[in-house]
């Protein structure tokens, strides 16, 4: 079995409801388009090898450096930068341990991609979103992390989309000069301005019996404890 770990970025944002595997894809970033290209390349091989695709959203957990940059300003300054001016964008998340469980389930019992779907805008089978059921507003995620850190009164700092894109553009230039990618970029700013990144894990729960082993709050606490114990802050 060939398991491709793709991303919700390959599918795109969703407003007003959870994105499902049957929705037409609409990637809005270079990262998302590259992930979608990988999906189609894998699907083109599905007549020769069994292929299953997983699409996690924001992955977090101990040891993760990219997610750490969300936690750090909350710990150090009590500030949570929020894309946009109205704080109404939601986010789906999955802890790395739960994602690992889903990978094993998909390898053992998952359906496989139909090679005919390589020319379609969605996969009818063999593709799963995997996430926690909670879909908090990104602004509220700051309060949840603050609670895990024992901090209250977290300041949600609205970052206008234009400012985020400017900062992302500068960060991209710096990364190119340094010769290695950074955590923040113009592409990430583009994703942050696009809307809500929320998806449904109903399919993987129904077909494979997937379930997260702890609540989102407990997983955030576990992650904070990992960072604290190892002095990352």
Regions found by a protein language model. Give the residues of each.
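Non-catalytic, hydrophobic alpha-helical segments
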Residues: 99, 103, 130, 141, ...
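Amphipathic terminal alpha-helices
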Residues: 199-207, 211-233
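Mid/C-terminal beta-alpha module of Rossmann-like enzyme folds, strongest
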Residues: 109-183, 221-222
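Active-site helix of classical SDR
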Residues: 34
């Amino acid at each position: 079995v060939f398991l491709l770990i793709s991303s919700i970025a390959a599918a795109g944002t969703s407003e007003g409801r959870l994105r499902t595997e049957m929705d037409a894809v609409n990637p809005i970033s270079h990262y998302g388009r590259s992930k979608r290209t990988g999906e189609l390349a894998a699907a083109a091989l599905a007549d020769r090898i069994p292929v299953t695709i997983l699409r996690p959203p924001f992955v977090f957990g101990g040891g993760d450096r990219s997610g750490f940059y969300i936690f750090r300003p909350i710990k150090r300054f009590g500030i949570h930068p929020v894309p946009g001016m109205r704080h109404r964008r939601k986010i789906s998340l999955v802890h790395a341990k739960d994602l690992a469980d889903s990978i094993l389930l998909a390898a053992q019992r998952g359906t496989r991609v139909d090679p005919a779907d390589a020319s379609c805008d969605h996969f009818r089978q063999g593709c799963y979103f995997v996430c926690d059921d909670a879909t908090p507003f990104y602004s509220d995620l700051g309060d949840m992390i603050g609670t895990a850190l024992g901090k209250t009164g977290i300041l949600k700092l609205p970052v206008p989309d234009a400012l985020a894109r400017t900062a992302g553009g500068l960060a991209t230039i710096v990364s190119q000069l340094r010769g290695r990618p950074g955590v923040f970029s113009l592409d990430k700013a583009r994703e942050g301005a696009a809307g809500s990144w929320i998806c449904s894990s109903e399919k993987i729960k129904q077909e494979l019996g997937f379930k997260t082993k702890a609540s989102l709050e407990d997983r955030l606490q576990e992650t904070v404890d990992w960072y604290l114990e190892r002095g990352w802050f």
